Amino acid sequence: YQGEFAGAVEAASSTGGQIMPPIMGAAAFLMAEMVGVQYGEIAMRAIFPALLYFTGIFITVHLEAKRLGLKGIPKDELPKFGPLFVRQGYLLIPLVALVAMVMMGYTMSRAAIIATALAILVSMPNKETRMNPTRFINALEAGGKNTLSVAVACGVAGIIAGVVTMTGLGQLLISAIVGVAGDRVIVALFLTMLTCIVLGMGVPTTANYIIMATTCAPILVNGMGINKIAANMFVFYFGIVADITPPVALAAYAGSAIAKSNPMKTGITATKLAIAAFIVPYIFAYSPAMLFVNVTSVFKVIQIVLSALLGIFGVAAALNGYILRKSNWFERILLFAGGLTLMIPGTISDLIGLVLIGGIVLLQYFQRKKAAA
């Protein structure tokens, strides 16, 4: 892979860690407070969007590897999972316990204390991982430092919320966006997205989310009738992707430093890799069933997720310009259109998108088969 692509993969993947359950970014804990639910519920509702995000990255990386003709590591050179799991699998016990306790409704403080105690216990059998007094003190110090940013963000959250309420700034912003959007939800979502991205350029995710959750999220909830969890998740997502969106793209700068690549090109490539993060929030804003909100049937959830997955594949293939062979511009336009069509709620739009993308895939398959004959 080229340096820009490698740096972009690092930036997009690490940024996605904030939206991936079970342990999401600090802003997710603030979201739980804002919405008034347990953190475990936020993590549960974020599963499908996060999986779609990383699936989109995987698809793009795979298509890029196919385009460049890269081959994987031979099977006999891969590390054996079984022996490795037997030797070190017990180290997963604290993480598994933490996830289980969060999902069972334990408070985060209680779950964290129990998981920390388990981490100390499982470190004992191995001399290399054993928590001696020095390591224990260093761990406490690191934990204290890491909690400072969250503690400050929680303190600032109340101040910002108070300022927005007392000065009428929130109502002013609501009136401005609703005035431009009218009753067009897509316009309100787009304006909110732009606000989140612009505000998030260089602003920490937690601070960005606090501001957006107290200003723009109420616009979507009160002005457009969007579900409260979906609205907060919407601003949460776009506050995060601001880290990989040029021209600032702080995560892309970090990735480019590691890969020794051009920061701006790395940011543009990272945006392509993370294209799912720019699309999926619109889907769950219109179809909150993806977040397990207002679910009428399991089939409906499956349909929404599968159509979103195929749509992400279409858009990723269009941006990458390769499926089974190099795609021409006409094929890329059809793939992009098919991908976007699949993300519009409705069976008819799903069928149209499926025909467009499926047609291009079949065309390339038969052309490649004919060329090989």
Where in the sequence are the language-model features?
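Membrane-interface helix termini and inter-helical loops of multi-pass transporters
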Residues: 38, 164-180, 288-300
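Hydrophobic transmembrane alpha-helices that form the pore/transport pathway of multi-pass ion
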Residues: 1-17, 27, 36, 205-238, ...
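Alpha-helical transmembrane segments of multi-pass membrane proteins
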Residues: 1-16, 42-45, 51, 185-199, ...
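Core transmembrane alpha-helical segments of multi-pass membrane transporters/permeases
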Residues: 109, 113, 134-171, 185, ...
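Alpha-helical transmembrane segments of multipass membrane proteins
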Residues: 15, 26, 30-34, 99-100, ...
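Short helix-coil transition sites and intra-membrane helix breaks within transmembrane domains
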Residues: 17-23, 148, 162-168, 184, ...
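Long, contiguous bundles of hydrophobic transmembrane helices that form the permeation core
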Residues: 44-146, 250-340, 368, 372
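Membrane-interfacial loop-to-helix junctions in multi-pass transporters
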Residues: 1-5, 86-92, 144-151, 176-193, ...
